[in-house]
A protein has these predicted regions:
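Canonical Radical SAM [4Fe-4S] cluster-binding loop centered on the CxxxCxxC motif
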Residues: 76-111
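Short, flexible loop/turn elements at secondary-structure junctions
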Residues: 85-87, 175, 316
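N-terminal [4Fe-4S]-dependent radical SAM core
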Residues: 2-6, 26-27, 35-81
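Short glycine/serine/threonine-enriched helix-capping/active-site loop
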Residues: 83, 267, 314
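Auxiliary Fe-S-binding modules of radical SAM enzymes
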Residues: 1-35, 282-328
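Residues at alpha-helix termini
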Residues: 2-3, 28, 48, 161, ...
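A general alpha-helix detector
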Residues: 16-24, 40, 44, 205
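Conserved non-cysteine loop/helix-boundary elements of the Radical SAM core domain that shape
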Residues: 99-300
Length: 328
């Protein structure tokens, strides 16, 4: 009231606002006395944390969907496996992850895989009494590995763990300039069920600014290759608020993505990380060149809805433009 600014998530600072709604939904088990209705949860989030109605309803909707997903996995006796590949074609402007340009570190990939294989052996022993629910290979960009390096890694993973109850096996293909038919065939050969082809934007000028050395056309070609190789579960990542982008840029991106029609979409609100080159870029160009609003988030949400998608997870980060969220 004093500043004229409204924060859509109110005073909430945690990364998982859906946990609040989930807590009440889990307490509403059959036989519970005085269970909270969705209207009660909405009022609680608005009155306690000053959340907007829109964001509170989004959290409740996603929590209900998450609850159904969790009921289908071994929530207490199971585990999920994440494997990180810390190499990329180049380092993006906004990135603060542990990632090394593959062309400078190519000679060390074999050593990294050897070390990773030792860690896989350790994890296998540590988790032998648990049930593996899902596997996610991320990075970095896992597809910076050569086809035979991918086969070496995937072979080790498949030989080390019981996949009989795995619901999903994801490899983040990520950058279009790292995706080839041979690599896609290697993923398919070892039973990968889901991949990500992540353009972040479908505007060429922005791709150039953020340091992604590929074209919009390469994104479209990589997506088509994946479909040709039989992948029926393809995700795409987008970032809203990239340098110089306006709602018109987001509209163009969503039009291009809708034509490809991925099976899922992850929409990130740009987060400014101290360890990224973006911090230096802002010093030189000004933060006013970064725009993300409820309006641009809504453009993305409407585009996802046109592809018959519904949000199923949500998280937030520090330093996010307009205090917004990331939604899948």
């Amino acid at each position: 009231a004093y500043t004229g600014k409204e924060l859509p998530w109110g005073t909430l600072t945690g990364i998982r606002p859906t946990k609040i709604a989930m807590q009440f939904l889990e307490e509403n088990a059959p036989g519970t006395q005085n269970p909270m209705t969705e209207a009660d949860i909405l009022s609680y989030m608005q009155e306690t944390y000053y959340c907007s109605e829109e964001k509170a309803l989004l959290a409740i909707d996603i929590a209900k969907r998450e609850k159904r997903i969790l009921a289908d996995i071994h929530y207490e006796k199971g585990y999920s496996l994440y494997i990180g590949i810390p190499f990329c074609p180049t380092t993006c402007l906004y990135c603060s992850f542990t990632s090394f340009p593959i062309f400078s570190w190519k000679d060390r990939v074999g050593e990294y895989l050897t070390a990773l294989e030792k860690e896989i052996d350790f994890v296998r022993e540590a988790c032998q009494d648990k049930i593996l629910d899902s596997v996610y290979i991320g990075g970095g960009t896992p597809t910076t590995l050569e086809p035979e390096e991918l086969r070496r890694l995937l072979s080790k993973v498949r030989a080390s763990f019981d996949f009989s109850q795995v619901k999903e096996f994801t490899v983040e293909a990520g950058r279009a300039d790292s995706i080839t038919r041979d690599k896609l065939r290697a993923l398919k050969e070892f039973g990968v069920t889901r991949i990500s082809v992540n353009p972040q934007t479908m505007n060429q000028e922005t791709l150039n600014i953020i340091g992604r050395r590929h074209t919009v056309g390469q994104v479209e070609e990589a997506f088509r290759l994946a479909r040709e190789e039989g992948f029926t579960n393809i995700n795409m990542d987008l970032i809203l608020g990239l340098p110089g982008e306006t709602k018109e840029h987001v509209e163009r991106t969503m039009e291009a993505v809708t034509r490809l029609c991925p099976d899922s979409l992850t929409v990130h609100s740009l987060a400014i990380k101290r360890a990224s080159r973006l911090s230096l870029w802002i010093e030189e160009n000004g933060i006013e060149t970064l725009h993300n609003t409820d309006e641009t988030m809504e453009i993305a949400a409407e585009g996802a809805a046109r592809m018959n998608m519904k949000p199923y997870y949500l998280y937030r980060q520090k330093g996010t433009l307009q205090n917004l969220e990331n939604t899948g």
